């Protein structure tokens, strides 16, 4: 997240120079003080840069993928659901994404991700799903995410079903990513705080995405309606990080942005607990390519998690 600072200002490559420069800017002979320096630039990243990989990883965790195959619904029918997803914790190597993969940030925030879903039946066998995560701070992050999906069954005969859904999301997540709390407690320039974080940052990740998913399922009547499903999807991720950190007396307001096409697959099953209550559990997989130094070629560091959805049919 801090790589733009280095790329746009070559004289900052050695952090010792940065310390020296900051001292000069803060205090001059005779007590004269200069205005605080603000660095604010925008850099477009290749999709396999470590910073871009991190943005894609976090965004993939919130894609509004389906749980099962779209089914025919009566127009005006409403189903409400609660989704709960496991978010894997990253290793220190995986979190080393800033400065083109040379500095570690804090990506291990929320171990789970939850949101409500409301699905409304529309004419011509279409259905609309809406979801919103309000800006309430939890696990050290404040999300503000609105997601939606339009789906329709393509084939329904006997136990077999095939369907398609289009989905998208807009919004952002705010948190101390660049300068987390466990780093700012150390003195700027110390081994534990090499890049001079002076206080917790308030970085903001914008997550705009769109996807198209094709799914198929088979209902097993002898297992009380258990329905295994499989789905594949193509996704477009338009991500952006706005850095908001203070390091060595300099305000970092740089912006990193990336556009990436990804593929994802899901496999799972739905099970009717009652005639109105449905439980769905699935595994989500999306390969994500990244080039980490000193490597010069990209490798797959995929996002994999388990997701669950409990749905109640109101009418």
For each feature predicted by the language model, list its residue ranges.
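Hydrophobic, lipid-facing positions within transmembrane beta-strands of outer-membrane proteins
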Residues: 76-78, 112-116, 144-150, 208-214, ...
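Residue-level signature of outer-membrane beta-barrel architecture
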Residues: 120-122, 152-154, 170, 216-220, ...
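Extracellular/periplasm-exposed beta-strand and loop segments of Gram-negative cell-envelope proteins
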Residues: 91-96, 102-109, 137-141, 170-208, ...
């Amino acid at each position: 997240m801090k790589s733009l600072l280095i790329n746009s200002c070559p004289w900052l490559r050695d952090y010792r120079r940065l310390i020296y420069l900051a001292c000069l800017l803060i205090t001059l002979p005779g007590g004269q003080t200069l205005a605080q320096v603000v660095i604010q630039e925008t850099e477009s990243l290749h999709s396999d840069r470590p910073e871009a990989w991190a943005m894609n990883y976090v965004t993939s965790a919130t894609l509004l993928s389906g749980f099962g195959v779209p089914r025919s619904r009566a127009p005006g029918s409403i189903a409400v659901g609660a989704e709960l997803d496991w978010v894997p914790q990253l290793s220190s190597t995986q979190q080393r994404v800033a400065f083109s993969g040379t500095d570690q940030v804090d990506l291990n925030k929320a171990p789970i991700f939850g949101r409500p879903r409301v699905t409304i039946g529309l004419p011509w066998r279409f259905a609309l799903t809406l979801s919103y995560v309000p800006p309430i701070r939890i696990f050290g992050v404040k999300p503000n995410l609105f997601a939606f999906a339009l789906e329709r069954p393509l084939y329904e005969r006997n136990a077999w079903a095939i369907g398609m859904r289009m989905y998208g999301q807009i919004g952002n997540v705010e948190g101390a990513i660049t300068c987390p709390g466990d780093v700012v407690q150390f003195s700027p320039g110390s081994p534990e705080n090499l890049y001079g974080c002076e206080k917790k940052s308030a970085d903001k990740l914008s997550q705009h995405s769109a996807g198209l998913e094709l799914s198929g399922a088979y209902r097993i009547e002898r297992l009380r309606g258990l329905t295994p499903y499989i789905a594949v999807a193509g996704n477009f991720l338009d991500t952006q990080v706005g850095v908001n950190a203070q390091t060595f007396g300099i305000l970092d307001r740089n912006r990193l942005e990336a556009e990436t096409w990804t593929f994802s697959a899901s496999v799972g099953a739905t099970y009717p607990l009652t005639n109105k209550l449905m439980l769905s559990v699935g595994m989500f997989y999306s390969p994500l390519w990244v080039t980490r130094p000193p490597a010069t070629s990209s490798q797959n560091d995929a996002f994999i998690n388990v997701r669950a959805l409990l749905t109640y049919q109101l009418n």
